[in-house]
A protein has these predicted regions:
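Conserved catalytic core of the tyrosine transesterase superfamily
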Residues: 1-266, 273
């Protein structure tokens, strides 16, 4: 009898998790990467509850506080703790909203106290050094220069850069069309320097790059003919920063932060000038 009840609870939990996944994806319109992160963090709680013999719908505030204490005890960074607990609060909010629970046991759950950390940014001189570290003698050299100029002058998220299409480019008007989070579209100004580097890249792209079917409209391609990936851009920037002697811990998002900072001194991305 107990095993049948346990099996029923497991099936119900699986159904709830599936509906929560749909809620994050369709109603909240979160990106696939964000949905995966929420699900991964939720699995940590589910594993804990299973070990304690607690059904998800029987969870109390005490249970959640016990779980939160465990995150601290095993040395998880406070920022990661805060992210995990934020995702869990989102899950219990969904359970109440979907009428699985009458009250939210996570409502009074508190995360760790963390200070505000300013994001790492690059100076104009450091950006010049990184871009100058690109070897234009390689097949990917001009593409890489166009990638970094576009990231910097447009302040794009790396996913937006990877999915940029030729049909999204409006060079005569000085804009590109970008599809951001939640499939929301926006027009973004692009610098004349970035336009020049993309056009130079198109000369190489059209002069011998093999392009896979259905990927002809993507601006930035990998060697195997499909659009570049987020991991590729991450490794590219890490490699160039090391080559340029930049010791800051940077990523593609660092270019977005640097773009935002430069906007304080330049009224428009098209007014941004560098010495190179």
């Amino acid at each position: 009898m107990k095993s049948e009840e346990k099996s029923t609870n497991k099936e119900k939990q699986t159904l709830i998790i599936r509906k929560y996944h749909q809620y994050l994806k369709l109603e909240k319109a979160l990106s696939p990467n964000t949905v995966d992160a929420y699900q991964t963090d939720l699995q940590k709680l589910l594993h804990f509850l299973e070990g304690e013999g607690i059904a998800i719908l029987d969870t109390t505030l005490d249970d959640l506080q016990h779980f939160a204490s465990g995150l601290h005890d095993i040395g998880i960074h406070p920022r990661s703790q805060a992210r995990i607990l934020s995702g869990i609060k989102s899950f219990f909010h969904f359970l109440v909203m979907a009428d699985y629970l009458e009250g939210d046991p996570s409502e009074l759950l508190e995360g760790p106290k963390i200070g505000f950390k300013l994001p790492e940014v690059l100076t104009v001189e450091e950006i010049d050094r990184i871009i100058s570290a690109i070897d234009l003698g390689t097949n990917e050299g001009q593409r890489n220069r166009a990638i970094l100029e576009t990231l910097y002058s447009c302040g794009l998220r790396v996913s937006e850069l990877c999915n940029l299409k030729i049909s999204d480019l409006y060079f005569d008007e000085g804009f590109i069309k970008v599809e951001g989070k939640g499939s929301k579209q926006r027009l973004v100004p692009i610098s004349s320097r970035a336009i020049k580097e993309i056009r130079n890249w198109f000369v190489d792209r059209n002069g011998g790059w093999k392009i896979k079917k259905d990927f002809e409209d993507y601006v930035f391609l990998a060697r195997w003919g499909k659009n570049i990936s987020r991991i590729m851009v991450f490794h590219l920037i890490k490699e160039l920063a090391k080559k340029a002697g930049i010791t800051k811990n940077i990523s593609p998002h660092t270019f977005r932060h640097s773009f935002a900072c430069l906007l304080y001194t330049s009224p428009s991305p098209r007014d941004m000038r560098r010495s190179r």
